[in-house]
Design a protein with these regions (language model features):
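Conserved S-adenosyl-L-methionine
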Residues: 55-59
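Short acidic/glycine-enriched loop/turn segments that link adjacent beta-strands
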Residues: 60-64
Length: 119
């Protein structure tokens, strides 16, 4: 965000008088922020230093994530750039087949059977 330009600003409106909401249909599940790999550990340290309850470092195979909730309960994610989706398939054919991270491979049949076609 520091470089400016399109999609480079985040504006936060603080309105403490609003009621806390309950998650439901049509609501926001989570908001993800991308960070360079070199900054990932600093974000983890900063959350911990500030006393923000968080998931700790989570390996998502294609990237690493940190999760924490803002005061109204929306889940925020800070995700690293790498290693990236091309770690296990050629970039030219990304998205042409169903690729699962190794820790989910044993559940492939169940996952694939629950997928709904996109019209």
């Amino acid at each position: 965000m520091a470089e400016g330009g399109a999609h480079a600003e985040l504006h936060i409106a603080v309105q403490p008088d609003l009621a806390v909401t309950q998650p439901g249909a049509g609501g926001v599940h989570h908001v993800a922020f991308r960070t360079p790999d070199a900054d990932y550990d600093a974000w983890a340290d900063r959350l911990n230093t500030m006393g923000v309850r968080n998931s700790g470092k989570v390996d998502r195979y294609w990237f690493r994530s940190l999760y924490f909730r803002e005061p109204n309960g929306i889940l925020f994610e800070i995700a690293s750039d790498g290693p990236g989706f091309a770690v296990d398939e050629p970039e030219a054919t990304l998205g042409e087949k169903i690729v699962l991270p190794p820790f989910l491979e044993s559940h492939r049949a169940e996952i694939v059977s629950n997928l709904k076609p996109i019209d």
